[in-house]
C-alpha cells in the first residue's frame, strides 16, 4: 500500500495522522478555529461545511475556504458536507450537495474532499473524476449511526470505495456491545492485510468504541479524528489526549 501524500503529510505511513474538525456556525468562528489549529498538535484540518450557517451561498463558501486554507499554513484541508442521513447537521438536497462540491472543486481551496459512498453513484463518479483532475484527493466514506454491520459487510464497503478510485477509504460504525467493536477492528485488520492498496480509516463510535480511535497503527487505520473544542462525532477525544495515546501505542507496539 502506498501512502497518500498531501503537502508534507504522508497518510498511511507511520502513526495514524490526527484530523481536527472545524464545526463552527459563523465565518468569524470558522476563521478563528482555523487560526488556532496552527498551534494544535494535529496533522490535518477538516472543515465540516454542514455546520456553516451560510453554506447555501456557494460563492461565499468558496471564498471562505480560501481564507481557511491561508490560515492553515502547511496543514492539509479536508472539506466535508455530512448529509443528515449519515449524521450531518443540516438538511441539504442531493442536487445541492453535488452542486456545492463542483463549485468548490472549480473555485474553492481544498486538498481533500469527502464524498459519501451511497450518494448518487453516477454524480459521485463524475465529481471524483473532476476533483482528481484538479489534484484533489478523494475520501470515500460511509457512516452507520445505528449499528455495526458484519465484518464481511464492512470489508465489502471498503473494497467498493477502493474500486471507485478513492484515495482514502473511510467507514464509521456504531457499536451496541464490545463484540461490535471487535468486529470493526477485525474488519480493519482484514482489509489492511489482504485488500488495501490505499489508506483506510475506520472507527467504532461512542464511548464504547473509543479504543478504535487510538489503535489505528495496530490494526491498519491511517487517520483518527480529535476535537479542539466541540466534537464532531460521538466518542471523539481531544487532540492532546489522542496524541498521548498514539505515542503510548507507538512506544509499546
From Swiss-Prot:
Pathway: Metabolic intermediate biosynthesis; chorismate biosynthesis; chorismate from D-erythrose 4-phosphate and phosphoenolpyruvate: step 3/7. InterPro entries: 3-dehydroquinate_DH_AS, Aldolase_TIM, DHquinase_I, Type-I_3-dehydroquinase. 3-dehydroquinate binds at residues 46-48, 82, 213, 232, 236. GO terms for biological process: 3,4-dihydroxybenzoate biosynthetic process; amino acid biosynthetic process; aromatic amino acid family biosynthetic process; chorismate biosynthetic process. GO terms for molecular function: 3-dehydroquinate dehydratase activity. It holds the Pfam family DHquinase_I. Keywords: Amino-acid biosynthesis, Aromatic amino acid biosynthesis, Lyase, Schiff base. The active site is at 143 (proton donor/acceptor), 170 (schiff-base intermediate with substrate). The keyword Amino-acid biosynthesis applies. Inhibited by flavonoids such as datiscetin, naringenin, marein and phloretin. It catalyses: 3-dehydroquinate = 3-dehydroshikimate + H2O. Its EC number is 4.2.1.10. The keyword Calcium does not apply. It is an enzyme of class 4 (lyase). HAMAP family: AroD (MF_00214). Involved in the third step of the chorismate pathway, which leads to the biosynthesis of aromatic amino acids (AroAA). Catalyzes the cis-dehydration of 3-dehydroquinate (DHQ) and introduces the first double bond of the aromatic ring to yield 3-dehydroshikimate. The reaction involves the formation of an imine intermediate between the keto group of 3-dehydroquinate and the epsilon-amino group of Lys-170 at the active site. Homodimer. Belongs to the type-I 3-dehydroquinase family. This is 3-dehydroquinate dehydratase. It comes from Enterococcus faecalis (strain ATCC 700802 / V583). The lineage of its organism: Bacteria, Bacillati, Bacillota, Bacilli, Lactobacillales.
Amino acid at each position: 500500500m502506498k501512502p497518500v501524500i498531501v503537502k508534507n503529510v504522508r497518510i498511511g505511513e507511520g502513526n495514524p495522522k490526527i484530523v481536527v474538525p472545524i464545526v463552527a456556525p459563523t465565518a468569524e468562528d470558522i476563521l478563528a478555529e482555523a487560526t488556532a489549529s496552527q498551534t494544535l498538535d494535529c496533522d490535518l484540518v477538516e472543515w465540516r461545511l454542514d455546520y456553516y450557517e451560510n453554506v447555501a451561498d456557494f460563492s461565499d463558501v468558496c471564498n471562505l475556504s480560501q481564507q481557511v486554507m491561508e490560515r492553515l499554513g502547511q496543514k492539509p484541508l479536508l472539506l466535508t458536507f455530512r448529509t443528515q442521513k449519515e449524521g450531518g447537521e443540516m438538511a441539504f438536497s442531493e442536487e445541492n450537495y453535488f452542486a456545492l462540491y463542483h463549485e468548490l472543486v472549480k473555485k474553492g481551496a481544498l486538498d481533500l474532499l469527502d464524498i459519501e459512498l451511497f450518494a448518487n453513484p453516477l454524480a459521485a463518479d463524475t465529481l471524483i473524476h473532476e476533483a482528481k483532475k484538479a489534484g484533489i484527493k478523494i475520501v470515500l466514506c460511509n457512516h452507520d449511526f445505528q449499528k455495526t454491520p458484519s465484518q464481511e459487510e464492512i470489508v465489502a464497503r471498503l473494497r467498493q470505495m477502493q474500486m471507485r478510485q478513492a484515495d482514502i477509504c473511510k467507514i464509521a460504525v456504531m457499536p451496541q456491545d464490545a463484540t461490535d467493536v471487535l468486529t470493526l477492528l477485525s474488519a480493519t485488520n482484514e482489509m489492511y492485510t489482504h485488500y488495501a492498496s490505499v489508506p483506510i480509516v475506520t472507527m467504532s463510535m461512542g464511548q464504547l468504541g473509543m479504543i478504535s480511535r487510538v489503535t489505528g497503527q495496530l490494526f491498519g487505520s491511517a487517520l483518527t479524528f480529535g476535537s479542539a473544542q466541540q466534537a464532531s462525532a460521538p466518542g471523539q477525544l481531544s487532540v492532546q489526549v489522542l496524541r498521548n495515546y498514539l505515542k503510548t501505542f507507538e512506544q509499546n507496539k
